Design a protein with these regions (language model features):
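Cofactor-binding beta-sheet edge motifs in enzyme active sites
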Residues: 2-20, 28-765
């Protein structure tokens, strides 16, 4: 195994191939690893930065680029803080042998983690100041009189010394300075520029190498054989049923896990199809048509996020009380390419090439599955098909490692489309109920919110391989979902899942951390057992909650014939959220939308509004959606999105714009067409006919984006802000166009027509 020192010494050659091949892209992650930390001490500068004899710089990060563009943005960050050119920086991402442990790439945390005063940016700033100090000694000058630029330090009299001459290929042997000076925005020469994606040339020319392209000498091919239905248990495997297949290497059976290994992909596919397994039947699945009612009847683990204690009394005194119930289906990641990993498990060392968003947690879980210490496992991130959440990336890595251990040779495993779509961790199904009381002037005087969330599993973390299907089949249990009653809230509200509407004061734990003014408030959540595996899908629970919160806010405004924007501003106190609300309304030339919808022939037009303080303080967005609804077919067609986003200082406007626009389109797909289906035994949406998403020939609406950048604020996440507000804005636009309120996503043509018919019947009654 190559040592980190050898790796960094040869980085000038190695990273070029990493960049062009795509083997080094960043992840979004939550925090540090604590007791699971890597051998790279995050408090030491040498864990992050190395300057080479040729003047190039290697920077190591535990945040990987999954397609969201942070490879480019964080290369800019290092170049800016170190005062070197963009071309001089070689960024290494997510390799447990060489990069620090920054947890998982998730939650829109990559930029907050590495951009703000910590981790990568602070390390680069520390390195710059250390080099200035070395140059001061070299020149016999005071460091404050020196300037750094283009990989060199210049003295007032014009003398110049290159970084390579000061330290080239040697270690800094310094701690990361928590007080190192960060370069201010008015000093930026690389950050803040619309630099095209550094991986784009390889992507558009077809030379980018995804994990599916990884090849290892002596590699075999694997396939897994999953149970035929949910909850089935393995009884027996007839290995004789595949003995006639040429090139078959081994059948691996462990607990309920079954896999085959062969010399060729074709032979592995044949063996997986032909292998005879006997399974016990699983329990019947709840009927899909009554699933949400079923969900609300299950035992639950309850939590009170806020509870002022007076909601019932305030509702009883209100001039008017409105109620609504919203539902959100299971949805899947729907990655275009199925998950793939390559594992090489030897007696003393295991290496896994994986598309995981969590290299160190994945290393820990693989070590558990292989019954060996984590230090003997190396996980190297290689980008897979687009995900932003938890598709089969972790599970396929576990499977590949177990198969490789079983045969003693490298194994490449790629899931079938059915493996992927039947067994991935779906986005959670939810039921959300609102009750709100209005005063005589129409303002909200009390709001009660209750939701039910279907949960089973999640990210495996460092010690929960059973949170995905592979670990469960290998004998590990997912996180406990034992029912428990709610206790009075004692923690301060952070609103990480946007469960609490933006208009609540959010008082808990001795502080009011909400964005709004409603002080008679209660939010009760029920976590119930899901029949399917669940986990993070871009904007996990945030999109579900914001859909319900923002559509209900629109209902309240409509009930008193108030302008939706004015009504929101009436109840908002957070200045950054108010800022994007006003910016979006101004850009869209918003006028009073009460009764604004118009109809011409079979088409009705309307516009809707929605806003969010993502996770309470991790990005702010407000969206105006203009739509056309065909009243004969029920088809909803967005024609324009106008969005305002505040994510603080912007590393790369081009990359941010890509994230915002991509989020709007994915949000449109999830709002209009995406839904997992099942029968009594299994998931039935296991191909692109059964699971619909926006097609490549979809007519993309016009998009106008406004960036709001307040002074003196920290960088926040951006990758999940726009998707979060899209379904609510579309639902509100449909109502504005037709008078029909859709409370169940997705807004399929059948549901739109049913809502139109119900509205017509109500008006005729």
């Amino acid at each position: 195994m190559i040592s980190r020192r050898e790796f960094l010494h040869g980085a000038g050659a190695l990273i070029v191939s990493f960049r062009s091949a795509g083997h080094g892209l960043l992840q979004e992650t939550h925090g540090r690893a604590g007791t699971h930390a890597s051998s790279m001490d995050p408090d030491q500068l040498d864990s992050w930065i190395a300057v080479h004899a040729d003047g190039t710089v290697t920077a190591c990060t535990g945040k990987c680029d999954l397609g969201q563009g942070i490879f480019t943005a964080q290369t800019q960050l290092v170049a800016e803080e170190l005062c070197v050119s963009l071309a001089a920086v070689k960024l290494v991402q997510c390799d447990t042998a060489v990069t620090p442990d920054q947890g998982s790439t998730a939650g829109s945390q990559s930029t907050p983690t590495n951009f703000n005063v910590q981790d990568l940016a602070l390390a680069a700033a520390t390195a710059r100041e250390a080099l200035l100090s070395m140059a001061a000694e070299h020149f016999g000058e005071n460091a404050s009189r020196l300037s750094a630029k283009d990989g060199a330090v210049t003295a007032p009299d014009g003398r110049r010394v290159a970084y390579a001459e000061l330290i080239g290929s040697k270690k800094f042997n310094l701690p990361v300075d928590q007080h190192a000076r960060r370069r201010s925005r008015n000093e930026w020469t690389v950050l803040g520029k619309a630099v095209p994606g550094l991986d784009h040339p390889a992507l558009v020319t077809g030379t980018f190498e995804f994990v599916q392209n990884v090849r290892v000498q002596g590699m075999l091919h694997g396939r897994v054989v999953r149970p035929p239905e949910m909850g089935a248990k393995l009884i027996a495997v007839d290995e004789g049923s595949v003995r006639d297949i040429a090139g078959l290497a081994k059948v691996v059976v462990r607990e309920d896990f079954v896999g085959v290994i062969a010399e060729t992909q074709f032979a592995a596919i044949q063996a997986a199809r032909q292998l005879v397994c006997r399974w016990s039947p699983g329990p019947l699945l709840p009927p899909q048509e009554t699933f949400f009612e079923h969900l609300q009847q299950l035992p639950s683990r309850d939590e009170l996020l806020v509870d002022s204690g007076d909601v019932s009394t305030s509702l009883a005194k209100a001039d008017r009380v409105l109620r609504a119930r919203y539902t959100w289906p299971y949805q899947m990641h729907g990655s275009l390419g199925s998950s793939c990993a390559v594992a090489d498990v030897r007696a003393d060392q295991a290496t896994v090439w994986s598309p995981t968003q969590s290299v160190y947690p994945t290393r820990s879980c693989i070590a558990m599955l292989l019954n060996r210490p984590p230090e003997s496992v190396r996980v190297i991130f290689v980008r897979g098909s687009g995900c932003y959440g938890l598709n089969g990336a972790d599970a396929v890595s576990f499977d590949a490692a177990v198969l490789s251990q079983g045969v003693g040779r490298p194994v490449r495993l790629q899931y079938t489309r059915q493996d992927e779509m039947m067994w991935e961790n779906f986005g959670n199904a939810c039921v959300i109920e609102h009750r709100a009381g209005l005063g005589q002037d129409g303002s909200i005087v009390a709001w009660d919110r209750e939701n039910w969330v279907a949960n089973r599993g999640s990210r495996p973390g460092y010690d929960r391989p059973g949170n995905v299907i592979s670990g469960m089949l290998l004998g590990y249990e997912p996180e406990s979902q034992e029912p428990a009653p709610a206790k009075p809230p004692t923690r301060k509200l952070r609103n990480g899942s946007n469960t609490v509407p933006e208009y609540f004061a959010g008082c808990a734990g001795g502080a009011c951390n909400g964005s709004g003014s409603v002080q008679s408030e209660r939010v009760l959540t029920h976590s119930v057992a899901s029949p399917f595996y669940t986990g993070p899908l871009r904007s996990p629970l945030r999109i579900q909650n914001t859909f319900a919160n923002e559509c209900f806010m629109d209902e309240l405004a409509a009930a008193i014939h108030a302008d939706p924007v004015e009504y929101r501003l009436r109840h908002l106190r957070n200045e950054r959220l108010r800022g994007v609300v006003m910016a979006a309304a101004k850009a869209a030339q918003w006028e009073s939308s009460a009764g604004r919808g118009a109809a011409t022939g079979s088409e009705a037009t309307g516009r809707g509004f929605a806003c969010v303080a993502y996770e309470g303080d991790n990005g702010y967005a407000a969206l105006v959606a203009d739509v056309v609804v065909h009243r004969i077919t029920g088809v909803v067609r967005p024609v324009k999105f106008t969005i305002a986003v505040d994510c603080g200082p912007i590393s790369n406007p081009d990359g941010l714009r890509n994230q915002v626009e991509g989020g709007l389109l994915q949000g449109t797909s999830r709002a209009l067409v995406e839904e997992v289906t099942w029968d009594a035994k299994r998931v039935t949406s296991v191909d692109w006919e059964g699971y619909t998403s926006l097609r490549l020939d979809y007519e993309v609406p016009a998009i106008e984006t406004v960036f709001v950048v307040p002074d003196n604020v920290k960088a926040t996440g951006a990758g999940e802000t726009s998707i979060t507000v899209t379904p609510a804005a579309l639902g509100n636009a449909i109502f504005n166009a037709t008078g029909a309120r859709l409370r169940q996503a997705p807004f399929t043509p059948a549901r739109v027509l049913a809502a139109l018919e119900a509205g017509q019947e109500a008006r005729s009654a």
